[in-house]
Amino acid sequence: MIAFLKEFGESRGLHTIVDETGNVLISKPASKGMENKPTVILQSHIDMVCEKLPDCEINFLNDPIQTYIDGDWMKARGTTLGADDGIGCAMQLALLDGDFEHGPIECVFTRDEETGLTGAMGMKSDFMTGSMLINLDSEDEGQIFVSCAGGINTEAFLRYEK
């Protein structure tokens, strides 16, 4: 995915960066007359939940997901579908490819969300320039996601003396 995203951005003449953690940033400049609008950051993650049935022989690193249509649903044979945040990635790619009036857009694709948010945790503070971020990873259709599904626990101790 990292190589695909890098090629996607570069082939369209968009500023594209891959950081040392493997996160990808593709920036789309504002359209004419919209340069003074605030930069909006859109974020999705590019990894998937790799689960399979015991009798399914698949190598998630090399083998394609076998899909089929069941009514109105796309499903996978013996594995998870691998579309956890695929819709978020697809929305970003459509915006990067689209011809519409817009302010500056930064599309951030983070890695390793499923295994501890290591992509987001490894991101440097200057990787993006925008001040507004919209996370495109949500569990339910038609709902806006306000915070992060991942997290960190902090335990602090304080000695109090009178």
Task: Annotate each PLM feature.
Residues 29-32, 97, 159-162:
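Short loop segments at secondary-structure junctions
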Residues 34-109, 113-115, 121-131:
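Active-site metal-coordination/substrate-binding segment of hydrolases
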Residues 16, 32, 97, 124, ...:
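Generic marker of residues within folded, mature protein domains
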Residues 22-24, 62, 153:
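Short glycine-rich loop/turn motifs
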Residues 28, 44, 69, 78, ...:
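Pocket-edge structural micro-motifs
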Residues 1-38:
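A non-catalytic alpha/beta surface segment that caps or lines the substrate-entry region
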